[in-house]
Amino acid sequence: MSNLPVISIARADGRRPLIFSWGVSSYFGWGVYGLNLMLHLADHPAVVPVCAVEFASGDVVLDPLRKRRMMAMARNSAPLWTALGQTEGDRAGLDHVLLQGLVNDLGAATSAHDRMLHGRPTVGVVFLEAATLSPRGLARAEHFALIVAGSRWNEQVLRNHGIDAVTTVLQGVDTALYHPAPRTGLFPGRFVVFSGGKLEFRKGQDLVLAAFRAFRQRHAEAL
C-alpha cells in the first residue's frame, strides 16, 4: 500500500472511522446489511461507520426519525466519497480498518468512483453462493487479515479450502420488524410458514421443503 494515495479521516469526537465498502439500501441484501450496520453503530462510543459507496435519501425506506439519522451518516461519509474522486488511478489506501464486501470467488466490490480500496487492515466480508473457490479466489484470500463469513456454512466452505483466518458473524433479527403480534385474519384456519430468499444451494430450500413435508403430515392445516 506504500505506493498508493492514502486517505485519512480525522474526527473531532475522537471516534475511529470503520469504513465498509458495499452499498446502503432498502432494496437488496447487501444494502440492508449496510443500512443496519450504520444504524446499530451510530452511537458506538469508539467507532463511527463510514460507507465507501455513495447513497442518498431515495435509496432507503425508513421512518422519519431513522431516515434523518441515515442522512446525517451519509453526510459523514461524503468527505470520503469526495476524497476518492480526487485520487488518481483505480486504487486507494485507507489509514483505517476496512470491511471489504466480497462476491463469489472472493472478488472485491469497488467503492465510490470505482476505486479498489486497501485498509489498515482489510477485513473481508462474504456471503458465498457456491461451495468451490478457484485458485485465483484462494490467492485473493491472502490479501485479508480476516474474512468474516455470513453463515457457518460459508465459514466451513472457506476452511475446507485451507483458509483459517475466518470467523462467522450472523446478522441476527430485527425484532422491531419480526415479533409476535395479533393475527391479521389472512388465511383463516391455516398455519402459514414463510420461507424467503432466492433459490440457491446456500439458502437450504431443499431442507425447508423436507421439513415442511414432515410438518404437514402431522398438521394438515399448514400452508
Predicted regions and their residues:
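Extended catalytic core of nucleotide-activated donor transferases of GT-like folds
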Residues: 2-8, 19, 62-157
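Acidic anion/phosphate-binding donor-loop and adjacent secondary structure
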Residues: 135-136, 173-189
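N-terminal strand-loop element at the rim of the active site
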Residues: 25-27, 38-85
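Conserved donor-binding/catalytic core segment of Leloir-type glycosyltransferases
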Residues: 19, 186-203, 209-212
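A short, glycine/small-residue-rich beta-strand->loop->alpha-helix junction that serves as a flexible
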Residues: 22-33, 203
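Short hydrophobic "strand-cap" motifs at the C-terminus of beta-strands
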Residues: 21-22, 125, 150, 169, ...
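Donor nucleotide-sugar binding/catalytic pocket of nucleotide-sugar-dependent glycosyltransferases
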Residues: 145-156, 163-180
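A conserved nucleotide-sugar
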Residues: 48, 209-223
